[in-house]
């Protein structure tokens, strides 16, 4: 069986390291499906839900919340270097819900203050929280 190694690395260490037969990621150019023997590539990633079909279980899908970064594909090794990443089983959904509410409040306060930079920062925080909630509920 053809397979590839998938690793997700953050400043806190390796968050994911398994053999896979398919992964789905989202780059700045859109969604990308990756199979073994994919052409070598480096691309920037956006905040998204990464889907991984491992080789050891046809019916199981691993989900990882990726909060930006880059993907490198080289010689059947897929390495994602991300600012932060969490597997679905590790996400505290209630904490993510609180982060969502906090970000929504910060967006409203920044809009009232006409602080464009703060609005953008809070919008990124909201996207991250929503991503974590979606992945955590899978």
UniProtKB/Swiss-Prot annotation:
Keyword Cell membrane set for record: yes
Cross-referenced InterPro entries: ATP_synth_F1_dsu/esu (IPR001469), ATP_synth_F1_dsu/esu_N (IPR020546), ATP_synth_F1_esu_C (IPR020547), ATPsynth_dsu/esu_N (IPR036771)
Superkingdom classification of source: Bacteria
Single annotated GO MF: proton-transporting ATP synthase activity, rotational mechanism
Keywords for this protein: ATP synthesis, Cell membrane, CF(1), Hydrogen ion transport, Ion transport, Membrane, Transport
Record carries keyword Ion transport: yes
Membrane topology type: Peripheral membrane protein
A UniProt-annotated Pfam family: ATP-synt_DE_N
Gene3D superfamilies in UniProt: ATP synthase delta/epsilon subunit, C-terminal domain (1.20.5.440), F0F1 ATP synthase delta/epsilon subunit, N-terminal (2.60.15.10)
Similarity field: Belongs to the ATPase epsilon chain family.
Subunit structure and binding partners: F-type ATPases have 2 components, CF(1) - the catalytic core - and CF(0) - the membrane proton channel. CF(1) has five subunits: alpha(3), beta(3), gamma(1), delta(1), epsilon(1). CF(0) has three main subunits: a, b and c.
Function: Produces ATP from ADP in the presence of a proton gradient across the membrane.
Record protein name field: ATP synthase epsilon chain
UniProt lineage: Bacteria, Bacillati, Bacillota, Bacilli, Lactobacillales
